[in-house]
Design a protein with these regions (language model features):
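Active-site hotspot residues in diverse enzymes, especially metal/ion-binding acidic/histidine motifs
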Residues: 1-309
Length: 309
């Protein structure tokens, strides 16, 4: 399970200013954002590769230079890494080229492309990609640059604060997420992420992406110890409900969801305990799009304590 992380305020401000310059250069467009217009503005090239036809990737990796130094003296190592790590996209700074895996479902191309555009906009990412020391290659460093690229992608695809303003003006229900998904042309999963983050700065909100929760619909890949692929915490939820586990939340979701093959699987009021031991009521709603199960949980009120006489 992947818990959502939060970019530091200073870095977020820097990234956001770079995204604003891009959108300003495009004349602050209406949604959905056309990524081909972004590529044209930034003079980025887009190509596709597939694991079963690596010829193009072989050619590219043979030509990657920084100055006069060839970064990948053994291009086969990069190709092997792409295969083993299941990389779905790649940005080549010196050639200003984005590579997308054509085997990935088309619905995911948009996010993957925006993620690589995010890398291209952040100069310190390009420095890290060019480096070869231990700090550059550390897992900690990798997680940070991926987090920042995701933040940049979200601010770009959702047109910075425009999405935030629209999300906060709508009902805190899954129907709003579906409406915004249509308007902005992004996937339900990425729209759920942004919706949770935008409406949950002061109110605790949680989102979950998992497989079908009903016991009769679970696949052979279901992992009872890690049932959630993503556990999305709004800033307020992360601050006040840091001890809530994915297992606890998934158990609550499973309790009210039906075995339907698509659409709304159910909704219910769920009790979660904050970091001070106080129970709170959340309204949970779960939707299944036949690929992923998406859950939105919104804080309603503190639970009333029983009165004894």
């Amino acid at each position: 399970m992947t818990k959502s992380l939060i970019v530091s305020p200073k870095t977020a401000k820097d990234i956001d200013s770079r995204i604003d310059r891009v959108l300003k250069g495009l004349g602050y467009p209406e949604p959905p954002l056309r990524l081909e217009d972004v590529r044209e503005l930034l003079r980025l090239d887009l190509r596709f590769y597939t694991a079963d036809n690596p010829g193009y990737l072989q050619e590219v990796t043979n030509r990657i230079f920084v100055g006069t130094k060839q970064v990948f003296q053994r291009p086969a190592l990069l190709m092997d890494a792409i295969s083993k790590l299941s990389l779905q996209a790649l940005y080549l700074p010196d050639r200003k080229r984005i590579l997308l895996d054509d085997n990935v479902p088309k619905l995911k191309h948009r996010w993957n492309e925006a993620h690589e555009i995010g890398h291209s906009l952040l100069p310190w990412h390009q420095e890290m990609m060019h480096g070869d020391d231990e700090n550059t290659l550390s897992q900690h460093c990798h997680e940070h640059i991926e987090l920042e690229a995701n933040f940049a992608a979200a601010r770009l695809l959702f047109l910075r604060d425009r999405f935030t303003e629209e999300a906060r003006a709508m009902a805190e229900k899954f129907a709003s997420i579906k409406s915004l998904q249509t308007a902005y042309g992004n996937t339900l999963s990425t729209t759920l992420y942004r919706f949770v983050e935008c409406i949950g700065t002061e109110k605790p909100v949680v989102g979950v992406i998992s497989g079908h929760p009903h016991i009769s619909k679970r696949t052979d890949k279901f992992d009872a110890a890690n049932p959630c692929r993503h556990f999305i915490q709004s800033p307020a939820f992360a601050q006040k409900f840091s001890n809530v586990s994915e297992l606890e939340v998934f158990k609550s979701i499973s309790a009210y969801c039906g075995r339907q093959g698509g659409g709304i699987l159910g909704e219910d009021e769920v009790f979660l305990e904050d970091d001070n031991g106080q129970k709170h009521i959340f309204r949970f709603e779960t939707f299944y799009n036949r690929y992923d199960c998406l859950t939105l949980g919104v804080h309603l009120a503190p639970a009333k304590s029983p009165i004894f006489f």
